[in-house]
């Protein structure tokens, strides 16, 4: 069976915290800011954690990422 590889696209988008959780940036932050409220833009600046339901799948993609 071939070696399992780290999914490079996922590895660039996710960082592991000291406690082992996965930190990610939020979606909807690339353009069209004129249509978004100030409050929405402020909340989008903060990083978020990968949800509990997605953890197993994302951890498989990041098999060897520290």
UniProtKB/Swiss-Prot annotation:
It comes from Staphylococcus carnosus (strain TM300). GO terms for molecular function: structural constituent of ribosome. The keyword Ribonucleoprotein applies. PROSITE patterns: RIBOSOMAL_L35 (PS00936). GO terms for cellular component: cytosolic large ribosomal subunit. PANTHER family: 54S RIBOSOMAL PROTEIN BL35M, LARGE RIBOSOMAL SUBUNIT PROTEIN BL35M. Gene3D superfamilies: 4.10.410.60. This is Large ribosomal subunit protein bL35. Residues 1-49 are annotated as: Disordered. The gene is rpmI. Residues 1-26 have a biased composition (Basic residues). Belongs to the bacterial ribosomal protein bL35 family. NCBIfam families: rpmI_bact (TIGR00001).
